[in-house]
Curated annotation (Swiss-Prot):
The lineage of its organism: Viruses, Riboviria, Orthornavirae, Pisuviricota, Pisoniviricetes. Residues 523-530 are annotated as: Plays a role in binding to host histo-blood group structures antigens and in the formation of P-particles. Belongs to the caliciviridae capsid protein family. Keywords: Capsid protein, Host cytoplasm, T=3 icosahedral capsid protein, Virion. Signal peptide: none annotated. One of its GO terms (molecular function) is identical protein binding. Residues 1-225 are annotated as: Shell domain. Residues 279-405 are annotated as: P2 sub-domain. Residues 1-20 are annotated as: Disordered. The record marks 227-228 as: Cleavage. This is Capsid protein VP1. Residues 226-278 are annotated as: P1 sub-domain 1. It comes from Norovirus (strain Human/NoV/United States/Norwalk/1968/GI) (Hu/NV/NV/1968/US).
């Protein structure tokens, strides 16, 4: 079978014009694999086998997290997708699996590449049996298993049988059993035919359908249906959102490989399923606030609602400022008094131990106080130090586990950088305060608590006035965003802050993002119009 358009013109010598650009390979024959017994071996023990609608067996549909891209940033050996055999590979089977306790059988997989004649490169698709780890797989090891090597210019779908190799009679839905895995890796890097210019990004999709021997076992008694909340983000422009480390409006979005790419902020930390981490509060009114009782020397911290703070249960009370590398200037109000007084807090001495529930404020008297961070200045100790808002203060213990600090985050994807939301922090210098998520996103996620059903959420940053997609972003379950900077520009990239982040779909963590500024237009009316 010619991997070229059938209506392409022929040259003088009779060769197909498209065939001169597209490699001639034969993908009509399926990958040679010995057949594996399907549901027949489970009939004797299951007592019942429930056949599937023929339409589902005869039609390929896109697998959840079945989108992938190949870009010039990828290198040979990079994993493009890693999928395991199971009902979750097909949306219809995933829906039906909720009605049964077990499943058994093989599946058929088609890989479709949206390549072109201007970019060349090869991928290798391997079927990895259970028991072999796919995380540290090399290209050489991948060729040991049933595999197919295809050019990204291939026009016809690549069909691969995914056999149910197992050491049990059938699989239980409530057990995490190892199954056959389909792993796709970059075999040779992308390159252009002319030798100059950047290669195009090649997109691909994974389509699946069950084999005729795929069946479900053991019907589950019906229960009251519970509606699952879909994952969403606030439909608000970035210019109307607030910083989650200080009560300040967002002034810009920081996209630059020059920024710090591993941070451990304790405020502004929330997982995509709504779990608060560190000292993050739900409400903006609790951000960068302190409450406690002073004896004239130290302030014994309490929670903002007045309940006692229990040392060793967290790094500090909820909402406690997490700005390190600076001195704090806090406007304090004593309960029972109408006046407000500003006190200075040095975050470097040994008396600063919020993990143990106490800090020291210069010149404060006895009483019950509540305060909010007003502005910052360079740290008093050591003398001559500069403000560094990428750091967090020393909470009073060098043992991370003892203080229950929120873990550090870093960009896990190929060529990705962390996305920071910046605000102008008051002080004697031009200080940009970064945070990982706007506070309104944290309130929304904590309220919705929508389950994460993928390894990353694909987001589009859309201009609500024009509908143009300004860039692709990924939101990871730990609660941070990443993107791929445009290599054509140097230094930090600036995007307008009137855009809206829109959830598109769940994707694999291997999904390769398009560089910022190269995405296509978005569809539909999204965001608020101003």
């Amino acid at each position: 079978m010619m991997m070229a358009s059938k209506d392409a013109t022929s040259s003088v010598d009779g060769a197909s014009g498209a065939g001169q650009l597209v490699p001639e390979v034969n993908a009509s024959d399926p990958l040679a694999m010995d057949p594996v017994a399907g549901s027949s071996t489970a009939v004797a023990t299951a007592g019942q086998v429930n056949p599937i609608d023929p339409w589902i067996i005869n039609n390929f549909v896109q697998a959840p997290q079945g989108e992938f891209t190949i870009s010039p940033n990828n290198t040979p050996g990079d994993v493009l997708f890693d999928l395991s055999l199971g009902p979750h590979l097909n949306p219809f089977l995933l829906h039906l699996s909720q009605m049964y306790n077990g499943w058994v059988g093989n599946m058929r997989v088609r890989i479709m590449l949206a390549g072109n004649a201007f970019t060349a490169g090869k991928i290798i698709v391997s079927c990895i049996p259970p028991g072999f780890g796919s995380h540290n797989l090399t290209i050489a090891q991948a060729t040991l298993f049933p595999h197919v090597i295809a050019d990204v210019r291939t026009l016809d779908p690549i069909e691969v049988p995914l056999e149910d190799v197992r050491n049990v009679l059938f699989h239980n839905n409530d057990r995490n059993q190892q199954t056959m895995r389909l792993v796709c890796m970059l075999y040779t890097p992308l390159r252009t035919g002319g030798g100059t210019g950047d290669s195009f990004v090649v997109a691909g999709r994974v389509m699946t359908c069950p084999s005729p021997d795929f069946n479900f076992l053991f019907l589950v008694p019906p229960t009251v249906e519970q509606k699952t909340r879909p994952f969403t983000l606030p439909n608000l422009p970035l210019s109307s959102l607030s910083n989650s480390r200080a009560p300040l409006p967002i002034s810009s979005m920081g996209i630059s490989p020059d920024n710090v790419q591993s941070v451990q902020f304790q405020n502004g930390r929330c997982t995509l399923d709504g779990r608060l981490v560190g000292t993050t509060p739900v409400s903006l009114s609790h951000v960068a606030k302190i409450r406690g009782t002073s004896n004239g020397t130290v302030i014994n911290l309490t929670e903002l609602d007045g309940t006692p703070f229990h040392p060793f249960e967290g790094p500090a009370p909820i909402g406690f400022p997490d700005l390190g590398g600076c001195d704090w200037h806090i406007n304090m109000t004593q309960f029972g008094h109408s006046s407000q007084t500003q006190y200075d807090v040095d975050t470097t001495p040994d008396t600063f131990v919020p993990h143990l529930g106490s800090i020291q404020a210069n010149g404060i008297g006895s009483g019950n106080y509540v305060g909010v961070l007003s502005w910052i200045s360079p740290p008093s100790h050591p003398s001559g130090s500069q403000v560094d808002l990428w750091k967090i203060p020393n909470y009073g213990s060098s043992i991370t586990e003892a203080t229950h600090l929120a873990p550090s985050v870093y960009p896990p994807g190929f060529g990705e950088v962390l996305v920071f939301f910046m605000s102008k922090m008051p002080g004697p210098g031009a200080y940009n305060l970064p945070c990982l998520l706007p506070q309104e996103y944290i309130s929304h996620l904590a309220s919705e608590q929508a389950p994460t059903v993928g390894e990353a959420a694909l987001l589009h940053y859309v201009d609500p006035d024009t509908g143009r997609n300004l860039g692709e972003f990924k939101a990871y379950p730990d609660g941070f965003l990443t993107c791929v900077p445009n290599g054509a520009s140097s230094g930090p990239q600036q995007l307008p802050i009137n855009g809206v982040f829109v959830f598109v779909s769940w994707v694999s963590r291997f999904y390769q993002l398009k560089p910022v500024g190269t995405a296509s237009s978005a569809r539909g009316r999204l965001g608020l119009r101003r």
